[in-house]
C-alpha cells in the first residue's frame, strides 16, 4: 500500500473552494440523501489528485505522462478509508488504483513518454468566459446537446500545486488546476446538478500558452443511458470526459391530484403515523390519507425541510398534517412524547441507503444496518405506539418482491426484509391489540430506486400500489375496532 486516508466534511469544503465544484451531492447531506448515493460522496477528482499526490511524493523518478485514462468505478463516502496502490510501474507504463475495503474506486492507466504538440480545439478562444456559478445548473438532458464554452479556473495553479505538491510534480501545476476545473465543469455546468463523473481520457501536451482556463464542448449524448461525453482542452492537456446525467429526484403526486382518487371522508376515522413520510412512498401515503379526510403525522430523520414541505402542501390544501422528528435507531418512547394525537394506524417507510458498495459476496455490516431499520426499529416503534393506543393499532410493513426474486448484490436487503416478514407474523400472534399488514412491494419510482437507465416498470405506479394498501389498512382498523366493542 502506497498511502491511505479518510476524507471528511472539512476536506470537502476545502476542495470545493479550490475547484469551485459545490454540487449538493458532495456538500449537502439533505440533498445527497435524495440521490442514488444516499449520502454525501467525495469528489472523484479530489480522490484522483490525492492518488497522484501519493504517487508523486514517493516516486520522483517517474517520467512524463503522455496519455492518461481514469475510471471512477465506485463512489467514495465520507469516512471511508481509501488506500492508494501502484499496480504496475515500468519505463513506459504506470497503473495505479484507489480502493475502499478492497473494492476499486478509481483506476489509472498512464503511458509514459514525450508530450504531444499543443492541440487545436473548435472553440473560439475569444469567446466569452462562462460565468462562475455558486449553484449547480439544473440542465435537462435534451438541452445539453452542443453546449460549449470557456471556463476560468476557480483557483490559480500555484495554489492547486500547494494543495497537491506531489501531483504537481508529476503533472505540472496548470494540469492539476485543469483537472480541478474539470470537476467544476461536470458538477456545476454540464451535466450540472444531476451529474456523475465516470472517467476521462487525456493526451498531455507541450502547451506553452498556459492560460488558466478550460475549453469544453459536449460532443455526444446517449439518451438511453443518460451518458454525456464532453471534449476538453486546457493548458497542457486535451481529451474528453465521460459523464452521466442522473435521473432527478422523483416527485410524488400533488395532494390535489391524490384527492381525485379518494372520497373526501374515506379515511376520516384515521390518525396515521407515517414514518419516513417526508418523501417517496411515505409522502404519497400521507397525501392519500389526508385527501380522504384522515389526520396524518409525518416523521423525518434528517430531512426536516422535506417534511415541512409535505405538511405545508397538505395543510394548504385543507388537510391535517403534523411533523415530528423520529430516528428508528433510537429509543422510541421519548421520541413519541411530542405526538398531539394518538395514532390508529402506523405506516413504516424507514430505510437506510439500499444500493451501496459491497466488498464481498456477503457483508455482515450491511445486514446489521438493514436489520436495525427493518426489524429492531420496527419492533421498538410498534411496542411504543401500542402503549399509547388503548384501542389498538394497525401497522403496515412494506416488504419487497426482492425477497423472492432477488437481484444481484441485494442479498442482505432481501434477507432483512424476509426477517421482517417473520417478525411481523410473530408480533401479530403475540401482541393481541396489533393488526399487521405485510405487502411485498414491486420496484417503484422513488429516490432510492432511481437509476441511470430508464427502467420499464410495466406501468406500475406508486398510486396504483399504495391506494389499495391504504384501503386495506382502513379495513384492518375497522375490524380491530369492532372486535374491541363487540
What are these regions (language model features)?
Residues 1-7, 67-140, 204-272:
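HotDog/MaoC-like acyl-thioester-processing domains
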Residues 1-40, 117-173:
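Catalytic strand-loop segment that frames the active site of acyl-thioester-processing enzymes
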Residues 34-91, 174-215, 224-227:
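Hydrophobic beta-strand-centered segment that forms part of the acyl-chain substrate-binding groove
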Residues 245-247, 435-486:
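C-terminal helical subdomain
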Residues 259-263, 351-429, 440-447, 453:
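Catalytic loop of short-chain dehydrogenase/reductase
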Residues 278-279, 302:
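Conserved glycine-rich cofactor-binding loop
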Residues 293-309:
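Conserved glycine-rich Rossmann-like NAD(P)H-binding loop of the short-chain dehydrogenase/reductase
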Residues 314-331:
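Rossmann-fold cofactor-recognition segment
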Amino acid at each position: 500500500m502506497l498511502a491511505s486516508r479518510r476524507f471528511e466534511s472539512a476536506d470537502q469544503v476545502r476542495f470545493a473552494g479550490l475547484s469551485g465544484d459545490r454540487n449538493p451531492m458532495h456538500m449537502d447531506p439533505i440533498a445527497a440523501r435524495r440521490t442514488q448515493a444516499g449520502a454525501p460522496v467525495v469528489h472523484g477528482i479530489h480522490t484522483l489528485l490525492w492518488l497522484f499526490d501519493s504517487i508523486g511524493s514517493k516516486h520522483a523518478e517517474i517520467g512524463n505522462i503522455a496519455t492518461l485514462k481514469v475510471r471512477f468505478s465506485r463512489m467514495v463516502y465520507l469516512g471511508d478509508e481509501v488506500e492508494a496502490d501502484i499496480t504496475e510501474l515500468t519505463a513506459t507504463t504506470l497503473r495505479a488504483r484507489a480502493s475502499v475495503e478492497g473494492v476499486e474506486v478509481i483506476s489509472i492507466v498512464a503511458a509514459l513518454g514525450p508530450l504531444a504538440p499543443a492541440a487545436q480545439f473548435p472553440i473560439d478562444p475569444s469567446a466569452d468566459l462562462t460565468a462562475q456559478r455558486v449553484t449547480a445548473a439544473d440542465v435537462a438532458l435534451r438541452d445539453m446537446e452542443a453546449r460549449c464554452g470557456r471556463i476560468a479556473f476557480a483557483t490559480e495553479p500555484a495554489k492547486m500545486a500547494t494543495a497537491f505538491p506531489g501531483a504537481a510534480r508529476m503533472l505540472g501545476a496548470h494540469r492539476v488546476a485543469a483537472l480541478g476545473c474539470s470537476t467544476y465543469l461536470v458538477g456545476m455546468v454540464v451535466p450540472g446538478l444531476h451529474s456523475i463523473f465516470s472517467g476521462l481520457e487525456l493526451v498531455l501536451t507541450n502547451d506553452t500558452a498556459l492560460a488558466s482556463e478550460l475549453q469544453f464542448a459536449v460532443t455526444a449524448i446517449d439518451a438511453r443511458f443518460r451518458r454525456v461525453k464532453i471534449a476538453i482542452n486546457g493548458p497542457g492537456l486535451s481529451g474528453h470526459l465521460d459523464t452521466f446525467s442522473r435521473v432527478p429526484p422523483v416527485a410524488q403526486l400533488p395532494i390535489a391530484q391524490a384527492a381525485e382518487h379518494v372520497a373526501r371522508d374515506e379515511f376520516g376515522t384515521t390518525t396515521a403515523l407515517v414514518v419516513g413520510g417526508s418523501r417517496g412512498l411515505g409522502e404519497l401515503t400521507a397525501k392519500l390519507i389526508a385527501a380522504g379526510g384522515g389526520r396524518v403525522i409525518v416523521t423525518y430523520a434528517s430531512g426536516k425541510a422535506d417534511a415541512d414541505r409535505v405538511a405545508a402542501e397538505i395543510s394548504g390544501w385543507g388537510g391535517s398534517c403534523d411533523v415530528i422528528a423520529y430516528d428508528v435507531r433510537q429509543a422510541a418512547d421519548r421520541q413519541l412524547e411530542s405526538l398531539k394525537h394518538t395514532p390508529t394506524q402506523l405506516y413504516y417507510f424507514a430505510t437506510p441507503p439500499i444500493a451501496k458498495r459491497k466488498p464481498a459476496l456477503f457483508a455482515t455490516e450491511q445486514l446489521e444496518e438493514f436489520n436495525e431499520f427493518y426489524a429492531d426499529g420496527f419492533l421498538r416503534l410498534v411496542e411504543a405506539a401500542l402503549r399509547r393506543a388503548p384501542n389498538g393499532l394497525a401497522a403496515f410493513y412494506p416488504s419487497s418482491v426482492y425477497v423472492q426474486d432477488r437481484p444481484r448484490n441485494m442479498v442482505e436487503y432481501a434477507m432483512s426484509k424476509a426477517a421482517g416478514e417473520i417478525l411481523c407474523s410473530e408480533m401479530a400472534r403475540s401482541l393481541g391489540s396489533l393488526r399487521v399488514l405485510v405487502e411485498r412491494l414491486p420496484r417503484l419510482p422513488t429516490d432510492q430506486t432511481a437509476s441511470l437507465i430508464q427502467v420499464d416498470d410495466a406501468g406500475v405506479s406508486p398510486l396504483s400500489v399504495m391506494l389499495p394498501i391504504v384501503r386495506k389498512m382502513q379495513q384492518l382498523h375497522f375490524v380491530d375496532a369492532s372486535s374491541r366493542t363487540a
